[in-house]
Amino acid sequence: MLRSWIGSGTLRSLCARRLTRSSLPSPKASFSSAPNRYLQPPTSADRVPLRKQLKQEAKALRSHKKQRKETEEASRQEWELTVGVEIHAQLDTEAKLFSRAPTSTSETPNSNVALFDLAFPGSQPEFQIATLLPALRAAIALNCEIQPVSRFDRKHYFYQDQPAGYQITQYYEPFARNGYVDLFDYDGIAPEDGERVRIDIKQLQLEQDTAKSQEYPPSTQLLDFNRVSHPLIEIITMPQIHTPATAAACVRKLQAIVQSCGAVTTGMEMGGLRADVNVSVRRRGEAAGQHQYDGITGLGQRTEIKNLSSFKAVEDAIIAEKNRQIEVLESGGVIEGETRGWAIGSTETRRLRGKEGSVDYRYMPDPDIPPLIIGEDLLSRLRESLPTAPDALLTLLVGSEFNLPIEDAKPLIELDDGARLEYYHDVVDILRSLQVDRDDKTRAGLARVASNWVLHELGGLLTKADQAWDAEVVPTRSLAHLIDHLQRKLITGPTAKQVLATIFDGDHRPVPQLLEEENLLLRPLSREEYIALAESVIALNPQMVEQIRSKNQLGKLGWFVGQMMRTGEKGRVEAPKAEEILRELILG
């Protein structure tokens, strides 16, 4: 072990004696060449403090890594990345796509299965019309052109999770085409993409989900067919994305849109939505590549990364695959069209199989399912009933009615499938009714105050307890009454937080009753009491008082305010009044 460390040129401390690089032989020297040297202490000229030497080595290593990173980054700038996204989302329906079996996947394995789901001979598909409605809502929300006539096709492949040997999808004539999604800087797109990017959507198609497989090494694999024929929509974007961050932002935005219109069950975090990404690179300034995808020409050979289950995985996998392809091309290699995988925490993608083409899947129209005909009257009704889109909600929340910062508005929209936003609106409505007697300026700020309590104070308690969102834990009326008391200065901020935690822990008493019974209502101090308390704190810290007076260090007044709140009776000292008295006594 010692020989290998010496050979690598890296010093290690194996005993209390401090050895230096100069006291060791060169990497090429053998132990037998100078056996007595290891028994001699280093000379004063050779002696270097170990801590200093380690710092120098660490500094040199950081410098080397920085130079290498800058060199690699310069090389990366020579290449253009192109990404297309495919999203598979489970539709929120009670029945499966082509059978009457229920769609619940949390039941006992293989308990919600029809004969057609298992491909029993003679069983026929029965298209469940209710599955079309959430799919249409998603297509309308994504600005798609709904096709009056669409058809189903068979995509043939053989795998244990697909008992029929084919998947029913809409390859040739999908039900929706030519949509788009707009991404803004607040969506998290890359700075180099500017303030806004429009990503075109090629098509939306209905298709079956597959069985859920669970592997038990070395040779056992269990299959749960409850998920077979669960209705999916596949959203296919055009290959117009050129940065990993924007690709992740696109997936995030698409999820937010299909969730906001009630089309899907859950998002990525719960397994209801999966993303595949197609990645290719080409050198800038060179002749256009020879590949074309979805009508866009001049691209490099693409690879597909399957089943990405988080936004971070989307971004990280694209970065890793981009770097891999560049390294292959710069070393004179050729990119193969293939399907690759990505594991969380990994630094590189891995090959799964060669990439199949449409010929390999042997697409053919399904002869057992008639064409799907969609009337304009149905579309008109759905458009009228569609909820407000996320971008419109954001505009509303940051506008004059609510005046929220964008940092608060976005989480309210995105958290808990819209449940947090609904809760927030209820709190604001109740709070405004309680504060109807207040002036306009006070009432105008209520929405921002409420967002702080819903997101940060209540959200913090949920995070600390590792608890999922539940609107009943702290009823909207309780939170509104608590904020009302705080705004009227009937309680202090610390008291309000204490009461919120009490309600969160299960106290169901109405807020006014709780405050009265626990003696938490603010009993304001008189001016004389404030002065006496301030004088006692000042007397204990004469040096700090002198610094405030002579050096104008007004920031230290806040420290005195804190001392007054700590030493005074709990919940009775108001910070603004305490600071006012301190300024009078210290500054005159």
Curated annotation (Swiss-Prot):
Cellular component aspect of the GO annotation: glutamyl-tRNA(Gln) amidotransferase complex; mitochondrion
GO biological process: glutaminyl-tRNAGln biosynthesis via transamidation; mitochondrial translation
Compartment(s): Mitochondrion
Keywords in alphabetical order: ATP-binding, Ligase, Mitochondrion, Nucleotide-binding, Protein biosynthesis, Transit peptide
Top-rank taxon: Eukaryota
Matching PANTHER family: GLUTAMYL-TRNA GLN AMIDOTRANSFERASE SUBUNIT B MITOCHONDRIAL AND PROKARYOTIC PET112-RELATED (PTHR11659), GLUTAMYL-TRNA(GLN) AMIDOTRANSFERASE SUBUNIT B, MITOCHONDRIAL (PTHR11659:SF0)
Family per similarity comment: Belongs to the GatB/GatE family. GatB subfamily.
Subunit-level organization: Subunit of the heterotrimeric GatCAB amidotransferase (AdT) complex, composed of A, B and C subunits.
The protein's name in its UniProt record: Glutamyl-tRNA(Gln) amidotransferase subunit B, mitochondrial
Protein's organism: Penicillium rubens (strain ATCC 28089 / DSM 1075 / NRRL 1951 / Wisconsin 54-1255) (Penicillium chrysogenum)
